[in-house]
UniProtKB/Swiss-Prot annotation:
S-adenosyl-L-methionine binds at residues 103, 128, 155, 178. Belongs to the class I-like SAM-binding methyltransferase superfamily. TrmB family. This is tRNA (guanine-N(7)-)-methyltransferase. Gene3D superfamilies: Vaccinia Virus protein VP39 (3.40.50.150).
Length: 276
């Protein structure tokens, strides 16, 4: 989800300055995952880092709840990167094997907390890069009693690439991602052909990719990208190609902003099909 505007900080530290994390619970690291001498080329990301100012409640959440809900992953060149060779040990993290849902960009955690609490039979992992949003999400997970949810502070595409294997995911959610309106910024859109191929590889056959946006041009961009992926097929799509609103998805402040501004909310639901 899109964060509220905040003053921009320098986007990332250099590889020499980058903070490196030790692997957290449930993270397997293969040989070569921390090769500090390697030259790393940073790719295009779908976000701009902002200053991590937190209020008292958010700071308290980071101090008291991070050890419960935040998965610390090995880093590569930046504080939101993921080291190649890392892999989540999901049974170790959750203490069981259960269907897994991943959310890209949890924002303030409204969707993650509500649906994790509503579905204790499933496990949930949310990606987010903004520290205040993560802290707010930790509070909401705790208040909801969502012990089956975790958060990772990382670029979601790197996380999908390095932390999960083929067919690990039952569902993936991308709700109200930054639309990056300017044409020269379209390469930053999280929904793009490369991400679609990656998501398809991580979804099990029959798994779902649920998306929503309040911007018409991004909605049609998503539709074009997903339609070009041969292993994804639309679910309950109308003549315009869009799906009905998923009734379980809570109305967040991001969706409310779009509705208040008079924009149409577009939902897309696509299923990963078997290769044949």
């Amino acid at each position: 989800m899109r964060p509220d505007p905040a003053p921009l900080d320098p986007t990332d530290a250099s590889p020499a300055q980058a903070r490196r994390h030790q692997p957290g619970l449930g993270v397997e690291v293969s040989a070569g995952a921390h090769r500090s001498g390697d030259r790393v080329r940073r790719g295009v990301v779908s976000f701009v880092r902002r200053s991590p100012r937190m209020n008292v409640s958010q700071q308290r959440a980071m101090n008291t709840l991070a050890s419960t809900y935040l998965i610390d992953v090995p880093r590569d060149a930046t504080s939101t990167s993921v080291a190649p060779g890392s892999r989540l040990d999901l049974p170790a993290i959750f203490g069981r094997t259960a269907p897994l849902t991943v959310e890209i960009g949890v924002g303030s955690g409204d969707v993650l907390a509500a649906l994790a609490a509503a579905h204790p039979e499933r496990d949930f992992i949310g990606f987010e890069v903004y520290l205040p949003s993560i802290a707010t999400t930790l509070n909401k997970l705790e208040n909801a009693g969502a012990s089956n949810a975790r958060v990772i502070m990382a670029d979601a595409t790197a996380g999908l690439d390095h932390l999960f294997g083929p067919a690990d995911l039952d569902e993936l959610w991308t709700f109200f991602a930054d639309p990056w309106h300017k044409k020269r910024h379209h390469k930053r859109r999280i929904v793009n052909p490369d991400t679609a191929r990656l998501v398809t590889s991580r979804l099990r056959p029959g798994g779902l990719w649920r998306l929503a946006t309040d911007w018409d041009d991004y909605a049609h961009w998503m539709l074009e990208v997903l339609s070009a992926e041969p292993l994804l097929k639309p679910v309950d799509a109308g003549p315009d190609g869009f799906s009905p609103r998923w009734p379980e998805r809570p109305v967040t402040r991001y969706e409310n902003k779009g509705l208040t501004a008079g924009r149409t909310i577009h939902d897309l639901t696509w299923r990963r099909v078997d290769e044949s």
